[in-house]
Each structure stands twice: as structure tokens, then as C-alpha cells.
């Protein structure tokens, strides 16, 4: 069995194939040579979020099987906005904003695939390089003539927008399918790209690209979609009460990222291990079986958090996340670095900025809502339930001082076992 056949079987076993065109032909096509595939990532923000992890990791899986991945960053399509299954029209951003996002996303994508000199070395491409070179007349004549509006409005992704009362769809967004389809034809011609992958919401755009490539280039190409990740409780994957989980450590810290995966529900964890890690399906099945047979805390969440944090933030990011987690649990903060505390300030703990040079602990507890009243704050202190930077506070008249802050900037207040507030001295 070839590496490619093993890959396709593995993708199926992981539940990573939603739809596929001509699956038997695709398997044969991939098994005969190093093939080039691509996935597009439109810059809708200055960072990718964890919703992009599945396609990024599938690009990596294909590369490991000997194929050449192209990560397309949509410098052109990002200026338009994909209407697929969106309730309303996206806000249009300026060329400068999108251009800046393109550069940041290029750097992020580069962390997931290998840019070797080998035949299957990865590349990052920007569709502004070819879409920006074609004028309107050429586009209408060479691309537009191959599309039937009758067929386009029957695409489920477009149909939902047209049928939604008070919404509709602009010609700008309606034309998105043509641009994405042209990407496939352009990459097929320039890079001999024969496979496009994407989320299952991209099926209409991908099949449009397959048809356009056949018409323009007279070439047979393929499409494969990946399932959109859902949670068993019906809530949206990748969102928390505090917002989106980003891949950029300046937007979501490695610690918060690690904690997100650690909080995965038992009903989701083994599915997520199949989607987001490179553990074999047999290894994942063994973890699941072990968790079922052993009473107490399951191992699945810890394995998932470690594997995905290592993939996105490297060994250093994982070590930091585990160090912070252990320190907060034990109450011993002596191992924390200034960078660790900056992570907690970003999104790890509720935080309060202090401008005064000192403040009583009682005031600190009530202001941070760790105590509902001064009386209750004193009771907590008297019961030994309050600590500052890992040291128990016994005196109800104790004062929090900037000179005692960690690295001259941070004071970690803990009440009980799990309630924290981070004071940041200005």
C-alpha cells in the first residue's frame, strides 16, 4: 500500500473527509506521483484562528505522504469576502489593512509545513499576484463566460443568502465564486496543482474551480472537503466567553490556548484528538479505552492540550503553559517568568490596573470582587484563604505594595483554591 492510500484511509478513519470528487480516481492520481494541492486562507483578521487548524494540518498530512502543499493567502479574495453560508455581507477592508494581514498570515501558515528544497517543499502564494494582473474585460471574457448564473444561484451557499429576507447578496460577493474558481485554474496552469482542499462550506466554490479548470485548461482536477468542527453541545467551536481562540500568541496566549483544549468536553475529546493531532487512530482508541476503564480524571484532555499547544506554539510555548498551570494550581509562583505573567495579564486571569503605590488587601479583595464586602474580606484573611504572590496573608490590616510586586509589576491575589485576580502596577 502506498503512503497516499494510507493517507486517504487515515483521513477517512479520522472522519476528516466530508466530500470528495471522484474518490477512486483521486486515489489513483495521488498514488502515481508527487502531486500539488492547495488550500486557501482569506485574511479576514490579522491572525488565523483555530478554525483554520484542520486544513493546515491536512496540508501537513499530505506533505508527509510525499505531496507538495500550497497555502494560498487571499490578498485579492480577502478584499471581496466569501459569502458562503454567511448571514450578512462582510465589511470591506482597505488594501493596506488586508495587505498587512496577508503578511502576518503568511508567517503563521509557514509554521505548519516544511519549506524544503525537495520536490514536495511547501510554498505560500498570494492570489493578488494573478488576479491583480487581469483586467475587467479579460476576466468577463475568459472567466465569466464559463459560468451560468442559473447554476450559481442554485449553490446552497448562495441560495441561503438570496432566500433570507432582508439580506440578499451584492454582485461583489456573488462574484467571489468566480475569483476562487480562477485561483484553481491559475494554480493548475502555473504550478500543476490538481487538488483543492477546504472546509465543507467551500464545496460549491471548489466544484466551480474544478469545472473552470476543465474548461480553461482542459485538465482533470479534484476537490476534497473537510468537515466543519462542531461541539457535541451545539455551541460554536473555537469561541469562548472571552472571544475567539487565535493562533497568534499576542492575541491568545499559549496558556489560554492550552487551557481551552484542557477544557474540552469528554464527548468531544477523542474526536478532537483525531482531528487536531498526529497520534495514530490506534493510539487515540487506546487512550479512549483507558479513560473508560480507569476511574478519575481522563487523560484525553491533557494529551490533546499538550499535542495541539506544541504544534502551534512549540516546545517553549507548551512548557510555559504547563509551568503557569502548575504554579496556579499549587500556589507556588516562584517558577514563573516575567513572560509567563505577561501571558496571564493578556488573557489568563481577571486583571486590574493599579496606579497607587499601595492599597490594603481588604480593599483589593472587594475591588476585584474576590469578596463582596470588607467584612467578608477580613473573614477570608482570618481563615487563611488569601495569598499574595504565593504567600499567605494573615494580617487583616496588611497592605499591597508595588515594591513587593513580581518583576516590579505584578501581584497575584488568590482566594481559596481557584479564585484569582492579577494586579498590574502602573
Swiss-Prot record:
It is an enzyme of class 6 (ligase). It catalyses: tRNA(Tyr) + L-tyrosine + ATP = L-tyrosyl-tRNA(Tyr) + AMP + diphosphate + H(+). Residues 359-426 form the S4 RNA-binding domain. GO terms for cellular component: cytosol. The lineage of its organism: Bacteria, Pseudomonadati, Pseudomonadota, Gammaproteobacteria, Vibrionales. This is Tyrosine--tRNA ligase. GO terms for molecular function: ATP binding; RNA binding; tyrosine-tRNA ligase activity. Its EC number is 6.1.1.1. ATP binds at residue 239. L-tyrosine binds at residues 38, 176, 180. NCBIfam families: tyrS (TIGR00234). CDD domains: S4 (cd00165), TyrRS_core (cd00805). PANTHER family: TYROSINE--TRNA LIGASE, MITOCHONDRIAL, TYROSYL-TRNA SYNTHETASE. A motif ('HIGH' region) lies at residues 43-52. Belongs to the class-I aminoacyl-tRNA synthetase family. TyrS type 1 subfamily. It is found in: Cytoplasm. Homodimer. A motif ('KMSKS' region) lies at residues 236-240. Gene3D superfamilies: HUPs, RNA-binding S4 domain, Tyrosyl-Transfer RNA Synthetase. Catalyzes the attachment of tyrosine to tRNA(Tyr) in a two-step reaction: tyrosine is first activated by ATP to form Tyr-AMP and then transferred to the acceptor end of tRNA(Tyr). GO terms for biological process: tyrosyl-tRNA aminoacylation. Keywords: Aminoacyl-tRNA synthetase, ATP-binding, Cytoplasm, Ligase, Nucleotide-binding, Protein biosynthesis, RNA-binding. The keyword Iron does not apply.
